[in-house]
Amino acid sequence: MSLTTDIKDELARVSVTRQSAKAAEVSALLRFAGEMQAIAGRLVIEVNLDSMAVARRLQEFISQLYDTDVQVHTVTPGGARKNPKYLVRIVHNADEVARRAGLVTRSGHLIRGLSPQVISGTISEAEAAWRGAFLAGGSLTDPGRSSALEVVCPCQEAALALVGCARRIGVTAKTKDSRGSERVVVRDAEAIGALLTRIGAQKSRIVWEEKRLSREVRTPANRLANFDDANLRRSARAAVAAAARVERAMKILGDDVPEHLAEAGQLRVQHRQASLEELGRLADPQMTKDAVAGRIRRLLTTADKRARDLGIPDTTVAVTEELLDEL
């Protein structure tokens, strides 16, 4: 199974005792995966889900909260779709469910984001809303350069509401328009881990963290072995050469190295094959790759000028053929 499937299976088993948290989860599930339509003069709510466990959970919660019958149907695969879908259908008292779940106002007007009760609710309700949104349209990719936790949203208002809920539980999330749909994205690895724990997917977090740590350990050893691309090899040579020059610069300047330049230089020396972007992420506080490059450049320029004044070899003497041949 995929990591996303594992997370949804785990979330579908999360025990929720507070009625307000159940209501927040249901509200998000209906908003992010549901559709309201009039059939034969009656309002009907339909929710399309990719997990039977999630469909049964939604059925149970709605029955408990609103004392109404809920139907669950299996939609067999067809066309380009290889896996079955599960349709949760609310016909009886659908208008009452829509109002109490915060899909519409008391006067029947559509609420495009999340309900005010969820937005201004407790921390546990914000967590429950995120759990519902992820069960409705969430995904998590394996750790890597482009790893991200994403939730597909029905509209911009819903996306902004979800970002607000993330902020309330201490997680930074951003909205983006991708492939014609609104999405909420969490990219920072620590934030992804914290969010998984918050919504109840602790076991999945451990699996994801183990994969991430394994990749971080394996990547430096494999990096040069996989350098079939000439551009990557050139980048590695340039990074190693820069590290050698930085070491020479530190010796030339001694205690006269400005602290902010020394910090950038130490990052370059300690992580010889890392890209400038990676060095920026390792800095505390984090910097852009341009800021890192600028500081290293000023460090080398300052050291080369000092070397000329002292009549000694500058930083370029540290870059030898033997050093580059090792790559």
Swiss-Prot record:
DNA bind region: 275-308
Keyword set, alphabetical order: Cell cycle, Cell division, DNA-binding
Taxonomic lineage of the native organism: Bacteria, Bacillati, Actinomycetota, Actinomycetes, Mycobacteriales
HAMAP family (alphabetical): HTH_type_WhiA
Family designation: Belongs to the WhiA family.
The name this protein goes by in its record: Probable cell division protein WhiA
GO aspect biological process, one term: cell division
Membrane-crossing residue ranges in chain numbering: none
Keyword DNA-binding among record annotations: yes
Source species: Corynebacterium efficiens (strain DSM 44549 / YS-314 / AJ 12310 / JCM 11189 / NBRC 100395)
Gene Ontology molecular function, alphabetical: DNA binding
Primary role: Involved in cell division and chromosome segregation.
